[in-house]
Amino acid sequence: MFYDFVPQSRFLLGTAGYPSPQILQQAAEASKSEIITVSLRREGGQGGAFRELLTQLNKRILPNTAGCHTVKEAVTTAHMARELFNTRWIKLEVIGHADTLQPDPFALVEAARILCADGFQVFPYTTEDLILGEKLLEAGCELLMPWGAPIGSGQGLRNIEGLRSMRSWFKDIPLIIDAGIGSPSQAALAMEMGFDAILLNTAVAKAQDPRRMAQAFAAAIRAGYDARGAGLIERRDMATASTPIFGMAQFSSQEW
């Protein structure tokens, strides 16, 4: 589903901002996630200790270009990550606005085109814009990672109709909700809408109990995925009785 990898878990977990390496390890194990995202800047800042922790976790690593604002920065960071982690995967972020952390669509497409041509398997952090999604696919990406809301905001799925349209438009493309998820119920809703996976970081890292929150998200994501597969009933404007009339007792008016 994700290029050459078919995960059992639909939960991708970020590794930044945890109170301690021990709590990160507990949360990652509790999440049952098979894929964790890692910032090259974090790796560079903590060196061997963090690398040892990643080895202990024994999960597939998805390096990212967090903090990059230009094509050159993103491409350079991606090449460094490939050499360091020995992977073709790269979560491509090219930030266009410092306050909203919204991706720069023009730089994102250009960087994606360069990296795909260089043999990378690109996971692009994007918005729900359909044209931008088309351009990223044309550039060589085989999946898309639309945001639910701005990074770290916890707002959930801020543009539900836009995300529904994206899911409908890209029927056969893996879509991973990336950013803005704040609660397990929001993650479950995204899965019920037909998205393929959820990537989140802050909602677990900043929880009072990250390990327990990771468990909650894992359960919610699984529940949403199963509910979608089981077939959700259609919403109705009016009530529909669930109890059949057949078999009800019949009384004669004379008895009253």
UniProtKB/Swiss-Prot annotation:
Q: Does the keyword Transferase apply?
A: yes
Which InterPro entries does the annotation name?
Answer: Aldolase_TIM, Thiazole_synthase_ThiG, ThiG
Entry EC no(s)? 2.8.1.10
The record's Pfam families line, in alphabetical order, gives: ThiG (PF05690)
Q: Which family does it belong to?
A: Belongs to the ThiG family.
Function text: Catalyzes the rearrangement of 1-deoxy-D-xylulose 5-phosphate (DXP) to produce the thiazole phosphate moiety of thiamine. Sulfur is provided by the thiocarboxylate moiety of the carrier protein ThiS. In vitro, sulfur can be provided by H(2)S.
Q: What is this protein called?
A: Thiazole synthase
Q: Which organism is it from?
A: Erwinia tasmaniensis (strain DSM 17950 / CFBP 7177 / CIP 109463 / NCPPB 4357 / Et1/99)
Q: What is the lineage of its organism?
A: Bacteria, Pseudomonadati, Pseudomonadota, Gammaproteobacteria, Enterobacterales
